[in-house]
């Protein structure tokens, strides 16, 4: 009997040790263009409308990163950085016109080789056939909100319903399948919402009808002292279209006029045509009376801008409501399946977004609203609930973090840093003191010039190198980045010091893609294609 007892003791101890070392599941719940200031837990200017109660609960259960940034504020490149753990110039995907090289080393391949059951559902935006996944179904390109097509290993399929719901349905089935297999899983649940054009679920079409969305303080920014900002094409005033972006004045039969119309108008028709007659009936019933009132009002000037902002912001936030609800659905599934306690849940988005800030929509710039991206992580038993982190982190860190969480080997050529020490409350002494940024997509949509730059905990230096223009901001005294201090003689030594830091980062990351300043003739030609505002053309500062 004693012999049997001594034989069983090490077996029990081994079982307990194995249980402790059980690999955690990882859920990466990812959205498109969700600005941190459109999440209640970030305490931004939209908090009063309570846009994300479920994401806020996730933050209460885990850690919220207040200084989370992207390396290149545009959809495809941001996703490529996350997959590869390398800056755009290293992974080869610098703008949305590129195609991702799936043959390269990416973290899902490493996790799969380590025994993880892996899946990718929703928006990939990297082109090509996803690799490193046991299961996948992705939207072609940007994808559609209603009855979207999905690319799968079996071919192209039309999926009836609303995209955010559909992608979450796939994720839920994968979780149940993984449990049955008894394997740890890594799930990338990647939503189209709230990307342009903003089409909410039918159940949310009347959400916010009874309130006015607060306006950002910079809605009527005049871009003084910021020359590049004067030459963009992303203003709510001049570049947000009533048809394409706001879905007004669509003909009852959805017939496209024979006379050619701008592509921005056709897109609205194409989106609406995906709806079933039943879906379209509900949509028209919700928006018809509002559109009629808008036409009768005949708004102009600032009144028109304010109306467009309200329609845009409400549809944007309505799209986010679908994301918020589906996050709750997936978390409930984890609870119901008994998996929540061993599942790391990560919420993020590919970059930030302008929700009327500086009078804009879209992203791309190194200014705070598009540079910042949300990052919230729940890790039961590891992260202190309700904690907030102010260290400088980037999407460059995600690949290493996921590998570290799983106990997998981290390749030496990845360029980020694992966030696991920060999640455990142990900041390394050598943690970065600045982040590096580089945007490439020019000339292109919205006409945001190429630029690179550095951001420290207080200062930001931006180099619009093809135009030979620099900007410098003190984020402590000027958080809205309205005053360019680059030419201020009192800041000369400080700027030179930070410029040296920028060069050091650029060289350290091996970025040799910064181009020389272009000839004046080229600069003039490029900016002649944009609707330049002169001082006299700025909207007057009137109430």
Language-model segments: residues:
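Bacterial Sec-dependent N-terminal signal peptides
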Residues: 1-22
């Amino acid at each position: 009997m004693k012999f049997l007892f001594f034989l069983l003791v090490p077996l029990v101890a081994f079982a307990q040790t194995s249980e402790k070392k059980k690999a955690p599941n990882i859920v990466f719940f990812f959205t498109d263009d969700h600005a941190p200031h459109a999440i209640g837990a970030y305490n931004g200017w939209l908090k009063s409308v309570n846009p994300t109660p479920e994401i806020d609960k996730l933050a209460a259960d885990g850690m919220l990163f207040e200084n989370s940034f992207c390396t290149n504020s545009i959809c495809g490149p941001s996703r490529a950085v996350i997959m590869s753990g390398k800056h755009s110039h290293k992974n080869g995907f610098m703008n949305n016109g590129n195609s991702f090289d799936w043959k390269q080393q990416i973290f899902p391949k490493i996790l799969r080789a380590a025994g993880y059951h892996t899946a990718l559902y929703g928006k990939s935006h990297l082109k090509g056939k996803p690799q490193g996944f046991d299961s996948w179904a992705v939207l072609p390109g940007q994808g559609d909100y209603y009855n979207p097509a999905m690319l799968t290993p079996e071919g192209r399929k039309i999926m009836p319903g609303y995209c955010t719901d559909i992608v979450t349905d796939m994720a839920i089935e994968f979780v149940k399948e993984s449990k049955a297999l008894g394997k740890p899983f890594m799930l990338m649940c990647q939503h189209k919402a709230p990307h342009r054009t903003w089409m909410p679920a039918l159940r949310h079409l009347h959400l916010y009808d009874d309130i006015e969305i607060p306006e950002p303080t910079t809605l009527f920014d005049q871009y003084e002292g910021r020359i590049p900002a004067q030459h963009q094409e992303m203003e709510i005033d001049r570049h947000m279209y009533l048809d394409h972006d706001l879905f007004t004045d669509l003909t009852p039969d959805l017939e496209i006029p024979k006379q050619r119309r701008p592509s921005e108008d056709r897109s609205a028709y194409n989106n609406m045509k995906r709806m079933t007659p039943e879906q379209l009936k509900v949509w028209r019933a919700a928006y018809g009376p509002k559109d009629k009132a808008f036409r009768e009002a005949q708004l102009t000037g600032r009144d028109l801008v304010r109306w467009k902002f309200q329609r845009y912001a409400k549809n944007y936030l309505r799209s986010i409501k679908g994301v918020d609800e589906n996050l709750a659905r997936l978390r409930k599934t984890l609870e119901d399946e008994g998996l929540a306690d061993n599942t790391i849940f990560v919420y993020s988005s590919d970059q930030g977004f302008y929700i009327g800030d500086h009078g804009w929509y879209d992203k791309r710039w190194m200014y705070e609203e598009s540079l910042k991206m949300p990052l919230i992580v729940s890790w039961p038993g590891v992260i202190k609930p309700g904690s907030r982190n102010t260290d400088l982190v980037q999407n460059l860190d995600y690949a290493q973090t996921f590998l570290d969480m799983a106990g997998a080997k981290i390749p030496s050529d990845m360029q980020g840093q694992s966030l696991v020490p920060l999640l455990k409350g142990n900041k390394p002494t050598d943690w970065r003191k600045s982040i590096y940024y580089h945007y490439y997509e020019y000339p292109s949509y919205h006409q945001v010039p190429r630029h690179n730059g550095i951001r420290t905990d207080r200062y930001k230096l931006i180099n619009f190198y093809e135009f030979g223009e620099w900007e410098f901001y003190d984020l402590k005294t000027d958080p809205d980045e309205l005053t360019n201090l680059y030419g201020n003689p009192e800041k000369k030594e400080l700027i030179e010091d930070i410029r040296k830091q920028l060069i050091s980062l650029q060289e350290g990351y091996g970025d040799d893609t910064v181009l020389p300043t272009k000839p004046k003739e080229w600069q003039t030609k490029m900016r002649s294609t944009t609707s330049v505002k002169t001082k006299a053309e700025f909207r007057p500062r009137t109430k």
